[in-house]
Amino acid sequence: MNQPGQPGVPVADWAQRLGWRMAWNVPDNVLDQLPGAPFHNYRRRSVPLLMAGFYQGMPGLAVHIRFSKKNSSPGSSHYSSSAGMYMNGASKTSKQVVTCGTVVLEMPSPVPELVVEEKRDKLGDIASLFDFNRSKNVVQGKGIDVGPASLNIYHVSGASPEYARAVVTPDRTRWLYNEGRGPAPNTTLGKVHFRLSGRKIIVWCGRNFEDPVVLDNLLGIAQEIQRWIPPAAYQDPAAAEADRQSIPLPQLQLPFV
C-alpha cells in the first residue's frame, strides 16, 4: 500500500475528506488499550494502518490488523526396512496471514456486552493451542443459543440470553451474512462480525482499507446494528459494567503526529 502524500492512496483521500487522522505501521501494543475481540484474535499481529476521527457525530476508529498464525501438520509416514517399522516424517509448519479490517463507533450511552463472531471448530482450537496462536480466548466457550439466527456460522456470547436474542434475529444474521458476501451492495466484505461493548459498536471483516468503500460499508453496518439495540439494554446494570472495561475512544493514546 502506498503512503499518504503519494498518488493513488484512496484511503488517505477518504481520511482527509472526513477530517480523520491516520498513522501507518504503528506498534501493535496500541491495541492493548482495546480489550476483547477482534483486537486479540491471534497473538502475532501488526497494525499497518490506524485512523481516528468523528463519523455522524460519534467518535470513530478504524484499524487494519494483520494477524499471522502457524498451522502445523504431521509429516507423512514411511516404512523403514532397517528399523522394520513405519516411521513418521517431520511435521510441517506453514504461516497464514489473517487480515482484519475493524471499525469502532462510540455511542452516547452504554449497552451490555454482546459478541457475534465466527463459530470456531473445537479441534481447530486445540491445534491452535499447540501452535501458540492465541493468548486470549484460547478455546471458544459455550455460546448463547439463538436458534436458527446462528445460521450454524455465528457464535454469540455476552450478557443475558434475552438481550442476545433481541438483537440477534434470523433476518438480521441472514442480512449480515448474505451467503458469505456480507451486506454491502457495492463490494464483497466476506463474513462480517460485530460486538457491542459499553458505548462501543465494533464491526470487522476480512478486508483491509485499500478500497475506502470497505470503510464506508463497515461504518454503515455499525449504524444499522445500533438500530437493533432494544431500549431496555440502555437501562441494564450490565451496560455500565461493560463500559468500565474499556477506555473512551477520545482518551486512547494513539501515535498520530
What is each PLM-predicted segment?
Residues 1-14:
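Transmembrane-cytosolic junction motif
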